[in-house]
């Protein structure tokens, strides 16, 4: 399927903290068989994408458990507006398309594009941790290190 997402964020440029205020997600799922489950799938994929974008970093011997390897909780997930685009798929069951991984994929780019639009910062390594955000903001203001 096809999809697009937009993130609305607030950035604390002194601390490098990024807060997601809202994500708008439009996804083509063919014929929507169960709208409530489709919206839940979109919300879950976005939560995973937030983790990829801002939190989850595997460091051998340091982040090998869920105490040290951070994943999003309900407090990290912003308001989500889901737009279900329906265009029957002649190949899919009852005209439906799959709605899985392609929800996760555009989340990190949407957040990073919002960060760049707000601050000029270009993040080259995920997750976008506060120190990486501060460094990218500094580079955007003054050129390379």
Q: Where are the model-predicted features located?
A:
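C-terminal catalytic domains of large/alpha subunits in multi-subunit enzymes
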Residues: 1-145
């Amino acid at each position: 399927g096809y999809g697009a997402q937009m993130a609305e964020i607030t950035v604390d440029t002194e601390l490098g903290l990024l807060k997601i205020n809202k994500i708008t997600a439009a996804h083509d799922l063919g014929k929507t068989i169960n709208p409530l489950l489709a919206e839940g799938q979109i919300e879950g994929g976005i939560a995973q994408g937030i983790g990829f974008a801002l939190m989850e970093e595997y460091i051998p011997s340091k982040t090998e458990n869920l105490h040290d390897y951070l994943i999003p909780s309900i407090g990290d997930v912003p308001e989500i507006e889901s737009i279900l685009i329906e265009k029957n798929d002649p190949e899919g069951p009852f005209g439906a398309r799959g709605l899985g991984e392609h929800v996760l994929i555009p989340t990190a780019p949407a957040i990073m594009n919002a960060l760049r639009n707000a601050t000029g910062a270009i993040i080259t390594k995920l997750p976008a941790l506060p120190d990486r955000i501060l460094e990218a903001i500094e580079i955007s203001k003054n050129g390379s290190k």
